[in-house]
Amino acid sequence: MSETPLRVSLSVNDRVLLHLLENDHQADHFIVTSAITRPGIAESCGLHPPNVSRAIRPILKQGFVSEHTRQIRGETRRQKTWQLTPLGREEIKNRLPSIKETNILIR
C-alpha cells in the first residue's frame, strides 16, 4: 500500500504569499483591515507576531512584497502593512499548481 507522504505544513514564505494574495483586494488602499498587519499575518499563517518581520524580510528583498504604513480600520494609529508586488503576484500564481497538489497534514 503506497500512500503519498503528507507534509506537515507549507513553507513560511508560501503561507505569507498566499495570505497576501487572499488579501490582494486591499492593495494600494489607504485604509485597510488588520489582516495585512503583523498581527493579522501572524494569526493567519501560524506565526508569532515578532517572527513576521523576519519571515517577510527575504521576500521583501526578492521584490515579491512591498511595505507600507497605513491606517487600519477601527484603530487610531497607523501600522506597517505589506502587499504583493506584480512580481509577487506572478510568483505565487506560478507556485499555486504545486501547492494545490500538496497533501498537507492539518493538526
Language-model features: locations:
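Short alpha-helical segments that sit at the start of domains
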Residues: M1-N23
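Alpha-helix N-cap/helix-initiation sites
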Residues: S9-L10, H29-S34, P49, S53
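A short secondary-structure junction motif
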Residues: N23-D28, Q62
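Short acidic, hydrophobic short linear motifs in intrinsically disordered regions
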Residues: A27-S44
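Short amphipathic alpha-helical interaction segments
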Residues: G46-Q62, T76-Q79
